[in-house]
Each structure stands twice: as C-alpha cells, then as structure tokens.
C-alpha cells in the first residue's frame, strides 16, 4: 500500500513507490535499473554536467537528466529506448573528442567508468579529425596529486568535493567554453589533508596519486578488507598489494563510520610505516651487541629476565594503544595473571578509557540538532570525523558551541566559542550548563536555572559556586562589540546576539544572577544593570550588561558569550557533546568529565530517544580497545574499574590465575620509577617511549637504568635498541585481529602482507610467553583469541564479531616476456 508521503511511477514498465522528492536516478536504482553517470555522487548535490543519465519521460520534451529530476505521481520513465541510447552514444562521442588514447598507460585503465561506458554505449570509432586540446601531461598540483588536464571530462566532482565536502575550495574551474579546465589558485597547491579522495571520485585518469603512478594494473592487485591503523575513527579500507608489496589503500565505504572518505595521513602515511630497520629474527644483547637467536633461546632469555625482575623487585609493562585487541588482551593477562603485577598501561595512558564506554556512535552526529565541542578539534587527530561535522554545519546549519583556547577547523561554523582557564575547564562546562537552564527559563519561566547555591555540585554555597563558575583565560581582544563585522572567540555568531538579547530580555532575577556568578569569577569584570561603560567596553546580554573593569585585561569566556551559547542549546532535541579525552590530562580532568556528564543529562531532558549523547575522541588507534582489554592501572579487562570486586573475582576465576587487586603505576609513574632505579624489569610491547614520550630525557634515563628490558616490536626503534631481548613481531597490514574505534565498534583486520623472516604475530608471541608463566592455553589463530575475549569479558560489541577477512587470492603470476620473445 502506498504511503501518504510516497509517489508511484513507472520505469521501463516496472512500477515503484518512492518518497516524495526522490530523484529518478534513485528510483531506477531501487528497481535495479542501471542508469550511467559520470558527474553524480550521492554525497553531493546533483549537477547534471555530464548528461550521461539522460532518460525519456512521457509528456516531457527532450531528455531530462535522471540525477537532477525529482519523481512525480504517474510519471512514466524510459531508460533503454533507442532514442535514449543514441543520446548517450552522442554524449560519449562528445566527451571523447578531446580525450587522449592513454588507456595503455593510464593508471585508471581497468577501473575507469569512461572506459567501461564507452565499451557499453559508445561509438567504436571517432569521427573527429581535428587537433585535440593539448596540455602539460604531468602537472603536480599538490604533494600527493598529479593532474592530467587532457583526460579531464569536466564532471566537476573534484571541485565540488573540495568545496562542498571539505569546505576548502582548492580546486576550481578556470576559463569558459572549450577553454575550461580544472586547476588550483595561483601559488596555492592542493595540499588539503583530504586531497587523495579526488583520485577515488575522478571517473577518468585526470587526477592520480603520485605514489601509485605507473606502479600496477588493477587486475594485478590483490585486495584485503581491513581498517586504517592511523587514528581511532577506524575508517574501512581495502589494502591493495601486488606480489606481496603494498601498492595503495582505497576506501571501503562504511557510511556509519567514515562516510566513504579517507584522510591523506591514513591513505599515504601508512604505506611507509617502517621508519626504522625491520627486525626479522629474535635478538639477544651480549656485551652491548645484538646477536641473532632462535625463538626458543629468545623466549628462554625473556622468561629468565622477567622471572628475575618479578622475584627481586618490581616489574611493569607498557603497550601500544595501536596494537590489536587480541595482543592487548594477552598482554594484560600475562602482566596481571602470569607475572602478577598491577603496573601496566599504554604509553599515552588508558586511564580515561572507562569514560568512553557506552558513548554515542559516530552516526549520532547526523541527527544532532546541537553540538558542543569540548577542547576537541577533529581535524587535528580524528580527521575524517571533521568532514561529518562540516557536512552538518553546511547542510543543516548546525552551529556548534566550541570550548577551546585554540583555533579549530570548525571555528567558521561556530555559533559561540568559549575559552577557558587551562586549569579550570570544568568551570566553563558547568557555566554553559547553567546558561542552558537560564535560557530555558526564558522560554519557560517555570524552569528556573540552577545558579548560586543550586550550583551543579550539590551542597556548595553560592560564594563557592561563584568562584568556580569561570573561565578566565586572557585573550588579545577587548570585551565589547566588534566594529569590523568579524566574530571573536567569545562572541555569538552574527545574527545571534540580537536574537539572544531579545530572548533574554525580561528574564527573572535568576538570569542576572547567572551573569553575576560568571562575572564575579572572572578577574577584571564588573557586572551592573543597564549601565554603559566606555565605548567599546560594554556588551549587552539582555538582562545584564558586562564590561571590562578599569585596567583589566580582556578575558576569555565572557558571560554574554556563555549565555549566547546556552541559548543555542536551550531547545535542542538531539544535543550531542563531543570531547577530546586529553581533557582528562588536565588538573581538573575528572571534574570536567563530571561536568560533561551533567551537560549530557541536561540536553537529554528534551531528547525522546534514550541513547548516549556524548562522543569521546581518543588519540590512538585502539585506545578504547586498550581500556576494554584492561591495559590500564585502574581498569580491569572488560573496561570495569579495579574496585569492582565481583568482576575482579570473575576474571580471576576465568583465567585461573591469581591477580593483585590494587591500582598500579600509570605510564608516567612507570617511567619515573624506572628512571629513579625503582623498577627491576620492563616489558615494551610495540611502543617507543624515547620517541613518543613528551619528556625524551626521562624516557632515555628510564630505559637505561632498568636492569632488564624486553621489547616485542617489528622495528628496531631507539627504545628497542636499549632492550636486552627483542622478540620480532608482525607489522602494519601483516597481522590479523581486531581494533575498537572511538565509538566502541569492533572491526576486524585482514592480513594483507606476509610476515617477513622469523617474525611472528604479536598474539602468538604473547601466548607462547604466557605458557612459560602458568597460562596453559594454545591458540590456532587470532579468531580463537577473539572468541575467548567475547566469552570471558562479555562485551556486547564482540558478540556479533564475524570471521576475520582473508586476502583474496593474488592473480596468477605471469612470466614477463620481452618484445623479442625471451623470458
């Protein structure tokens, strides 16, 4: 039965019902009818530039483009008539007039839509005898991208991607008519961190990757489904290899995670991950020099060193939060159960990991009608997430409230931006929550804001609350209205200040009290009713006026900015708070987390869906997985706190190993203890403190002074060079296993490249080492370890984990034959 909001039409004799506003192209796709396109991309607005999707519609003249024509009731569409196919053939002939016959050398050959559609619809011979357009063949338009303008068919996908998706128009259309070409602005290269995506969406070989040019043919490549190991977003990728060598990475679209895009750091950076010499056999240091050893000798030496350290003193372990869940699980079990030490952590720390459990999914950004970013700038660390937030700002008009002391990639869209005192971020978040209550009180006077003695933390006096509800970091801009039309960090976006002033005018004394609360905590600010100060020194907030006191420096989160931000969030039905886990490294980290939870609860009051509305942004690829596997001093496997005695006993029983029920040293404490001569043994799993720890001197001193240092690593890093024993492990794209992204989604990795030499899977090494410390368990594959994780830790995300992807068989290797016929 047709729904009220649906339209019924007929395409090629088949009837279909689709929602109103659906494009003819999508309606045809619903029926499984293939309509060819070049310029269409479902993530961009339709353009109708290539004219390949022309169809015939009864009672309409001409051939309208299916990609830009909405359906209508009773519409009769034909996609396969003789007239339609003749039109497509003509369009292909037109596109091929200036297109060079580069197919034998073009990197796009074999996966080229123009090539494919020409074989299917196009003419077999060209009638064009005049000279074709000629351009420089190899034009380096950016560090990673090469442009061949002769091949370009002017579909404008690349231009629209940079302008509409990235919001950075680095590619433009130049000139007009038959002189039109794609190019960059003079003196400005295509250096966007998302530039590699233009090579994926280009339907011809006009835009190619510098690193992949002339390297391989698509039919010679083996493809392995995997996950990008660069950051915690967990973008899905296909690893393309040829004869065991990495060739390129391409996106494997997962709409709920990456929206089909990749950043250049992940796309190109991981191809050259081996920055140091590769370790392919076990090494034991004797007389200051590494000597090759057998696996049995190396494991025996590792066992001896760890036993001596455990017996004689203190033992600790540091793991990489880039490791797989399987490695981290076995590492934690070895340290906690086999070696009975509570001192384990990832180098960047997983102590905040429990805060992320049960958080919002990435897809929550799509339906959010208000977003708060707390010291978070995804373009810096979780890049693809930035594109999703940009899309919401551009397409839905979402104006995020940004709490940050730095310039961020989303500042241009901000409805309000609040700075904070570096040691008191929590106060700004609490003040924002109070501002939301104040704004709601204006819309509904019965809802009184909680200020003064009703501060977010119950039991505090009004004076104490006033002292804490502040964000007094100084800035270079005086508090006051702008004269150049530009918005400063702590001002509402243009068009909001007046509306907020009107909305807040006439509020109850509670609103004035909120401004008073904020003002009293900001040094140099005075609060007074309806009183003007010197020109350029006042800011109206409706019920109150806030001005800079005499001789005071300009301050950070001004009360009017906080109130403006509160107004933006007051009516949100699907509010979302996004914070970077680095806030937990601040002195008031836990207080900030509590304030964020309070803000989440406040936003959830108008939310009809009972889902989490906080998204935590971690730093490393598998930070959340590390916390869930218990590689943190205060966190048990399963992501539960060490204080959960019932769960502690259950894990201990499952493992059959006694554990110490105490909170151990974190990464900083472990390195300090080692540097102070208080540590007798240290196990480094795929981590390099010398290069990754903020204080290199402390890291070097720590590794130099520890009596026994064991390193499990794929590379001979500066830290590994200090080790007494090195166990060679698999590297990037050589291991199978799983990673947990920042939203808690467990995704599997496929082995794309064989492990070189005598190196082994990390989980295999840890299982072998664990057997020497009473953990009697053998594993045939990483999948078996994964099943144990699911059974033991009962994490919901693991229950539906499928089989690990396998690399598809490589094409049959052919002997290369020279022109003379010899091999």
Regions found by a protein language model. Give the residues of each.
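A basic, amphipathic helix-loop patch mediating RNA/tRNA/ribosome contacts
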Residues: 24-58
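Fe-S ferredoxin-like electron-transfer domains
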Residues: 51-229, 233-237, 242-249
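Short, structural beta-strand-to-alpha-helix junction motif
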Residues: 22-26, 324, 666, 761
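Short, glycine-/polar-rich solvent-exposed loops and beta-turns at beta-strand/coil boundaries
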Residues: 40-47, 69-70, 176, 784-785
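Iron-sulfur (Fe-S) cluster-binding modules
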Residues: 1-36, 74-132, 255-258, 484, ...
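Short beta-alpha connecting loops at secondary-structure transitions
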Residues: 9-10, 73-79, 182-187, 412-420, ...
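Catalytic alpha/large subunits of respiratory electron-transfer oxidoreductases
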Residues: 96, 100, 148-150, 154-155, ...
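N-terminal leader/propeptide and maturation segments of large enzyme subunits in energy/redox metabolism
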Residues: 101-132, 138, 576, 658, ...
């Amino acid at each position: 039965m047709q729904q009220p909001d649906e339209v019924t039409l007929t395409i090629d004799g088949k009837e279909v019902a689709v929602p109103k506003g659906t494009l003819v192209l999508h309606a045809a796709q619903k029926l499984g009818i293939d309509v060819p396109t070049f310029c269409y991309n479902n993530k961009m607005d339709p353009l109708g530039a290539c004219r390949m999707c022309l169809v015939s519609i009864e009672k309409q003249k001409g051939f309208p483009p299916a990609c830009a024509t909405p359906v209508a009731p009773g519409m009769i569409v034909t996609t396969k008539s003789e007239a339609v196919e003749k039109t497509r053939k003509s369009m292909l002939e037109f596109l091929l007039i200036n297109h060079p016959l580069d197919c034998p050398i073009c990197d796009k050959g074999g996966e080229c839509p123009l090539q494919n559609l020409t074989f299917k619809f196009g003419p077999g011979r060209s009638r064009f005898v005049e000279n074709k357009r000629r351009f420089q063949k190899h034009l380096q338009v950016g560090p990673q991208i090469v442009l061949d303008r002769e091949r370009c068919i002017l579909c404008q996908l690349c231009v629209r991607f940079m302008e509409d998706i990235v919001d950075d128009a680095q590619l433009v259309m130049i000139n007009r008519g038959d002189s039109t070409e794609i190019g960059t602005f003079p003196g400005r290269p295509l250096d966007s961190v998302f530039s590699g995506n233009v090579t994926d969406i280009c339907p011809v070989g006009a835009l190619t990757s510098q690193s992949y040019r002339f390297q391989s043919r698509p039919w010679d490549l083996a493809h392995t489904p995997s996950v990008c190991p660069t950051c915690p977003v967990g973008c899905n990728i296909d690893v393309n290899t040829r004869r065991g060598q990495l060739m390129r990475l391409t996106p494997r679209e997962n709409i709920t995670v990456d929206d089909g895009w990749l950043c250049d750091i992940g796309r190109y950076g991981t191809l050259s991950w081996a920055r140091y010499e590769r370790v392919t056999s076990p090494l034991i240091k004797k007389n200051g020099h590494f000597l090759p050893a057998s696996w049995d000798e190396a494991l025996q030496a590792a066992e001896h060193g760890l036993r001596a350290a455990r017996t004689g003193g203190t033992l600790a372990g540091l793991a990489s939060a880039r490791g797989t869940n399987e490695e981290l699980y076995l590492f934690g079990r070895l340290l906690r159960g086999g070696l009975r030490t509570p001192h384990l952590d990832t180098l960047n720390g997983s102590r905040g990991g429990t805060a992320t459990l049960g958080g919002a999914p990435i897809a929550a950004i799509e339906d959010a009608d208000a977003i708060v970013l707390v010291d978070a700038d995804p373009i810096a660390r979780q890049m693809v997430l930035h594109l999703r937030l940009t899309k919401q700002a551009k397409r839905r008009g979402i104006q995020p409230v940004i709490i940050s002391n730095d310039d961020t990639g989303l500042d241009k869209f901000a409805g309000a931006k609040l700075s904070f005192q570096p040691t008191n971020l929590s106060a700004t978040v609490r003040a924002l929550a109070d501002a939301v209550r104040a704004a709601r009180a204006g819309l509904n006077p019965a809802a009184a804001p909680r200020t003064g003695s009703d501060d977010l933390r119950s039991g505090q006096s009004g004076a104490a609350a006033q002292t804490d509800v502040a964000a007094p970091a100084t800035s270079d801009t005086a508090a006051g209205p702008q004269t150049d039309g530009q918005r400063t960090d702590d001002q509402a976006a243009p068009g909001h200040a007046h509306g907020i002033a009107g909305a807040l005018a006439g509020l109850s004394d509670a609103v004035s009290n909120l401004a008073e609360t904020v003002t009293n905590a900001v040094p140099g600010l005075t609060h007074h009713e309806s009183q003007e100060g010197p020109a350029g020194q006042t800011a109206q907030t409706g019920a109150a006026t806030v001005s800079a006191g005499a001789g005071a420096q300009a301050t950070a989160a001004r009360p009017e900015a906080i109130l403006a931000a509160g107004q933006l969030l007051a009516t949100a039905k699907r509010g979302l708070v996004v914070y970077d886990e680095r806030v937990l490294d601040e002195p008031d980290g836990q207080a900030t987390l509590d304030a964020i939870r309070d803000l989440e609860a406040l936003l959830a009051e108008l939310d009809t869906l009972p889902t989490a509305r906080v998204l935590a942004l971690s730093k490393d690829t598998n930070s959340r997985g590390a916390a869930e596997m218990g590689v943190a001093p205060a966190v048990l496997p399963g992501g539960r706190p060490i204080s959960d005695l019932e769960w502690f006993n259950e894990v201990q029983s499952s493992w059959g190993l006694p554990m110490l029920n105490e909170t151990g040293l974190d990464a900083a404490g472990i390195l300090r203890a080692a540097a102070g001569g208080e540590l007798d043994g240290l196990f480094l799993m795929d981590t390099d403190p010398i290069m990754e720890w903020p204080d290199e001197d402390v890291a070097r001193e720590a590794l130099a002074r520890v009596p026994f240092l064991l390193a499990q690593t794929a590379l001979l890093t500066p830290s590994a060079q200090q080790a007494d024993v090195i166990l060679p492990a698999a590297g990037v794209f050589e291991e199978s296993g799983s990673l947990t992204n920042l939203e808690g989604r467990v995704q599997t990795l496929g082995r794309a490249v064989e492990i070189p030499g005598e190196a082994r899977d990390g989980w295999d090494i840890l299982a072998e080492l664990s057997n020497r410390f009473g953990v009697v368990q053998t594993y045939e594959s990483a999948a078996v370890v994964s099943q144990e994780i699911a059974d033991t830790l009962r994490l919901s995300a693991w229950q539906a984990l499928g089989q690990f992807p396998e690399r598809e068989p490589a094409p049959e290797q052919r002997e290369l034959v020279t022109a003379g016929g010899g091999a």
